Amino acid sequence: MMNRLLVFLMLGAAFMLVVSAIDQDANDINKRGVPCLCDSDGPSVRGNTLSGIIWLAGCPSGWHNCKKHGPTIGWCCKQ
């Protein structure tokens, strides 16, 4: 009985560790946003820095649209 309890507690602790790590990754993405390729970055994503951030509802104050044609969803904005 005691061994089953210990196994249950260890599995619960491992599950909580995984869930907290996934949550931290999601928070980092929310703060950073999804990078996109501005026109000033060059023609290809290979070897170029992605200096823009995709915003779904238009560029916020202090940012400008840095790509003439799309992404398909949202705007590629740069400070």
Swiss-Prot record:
It holds the Pfam family Toxin_4. Keywords: Cleavage on pair of basic residues, Disulfide bond, Ion channel impairing toxin, Nematocyst, Neurotoxin, Secreted, Signal, Toxin, Voltage-gated sodium channel impairing toxin. Its main location: secreted. This is Delta-actitoxin-Avd1c 4. Residues 1-21 form the signal peptide. It is found in: Secreted; Nematocyst. Belongs to the sea anemone sodium channel inhibitory toxin family. Type I subfamily. GO terms for cellular component: extracellular region; nematocyst. This protein is encoded by at least 3 different genes. At least 3 other genes code for a similar Av2 with an Ile (instead a Val) at position 34.
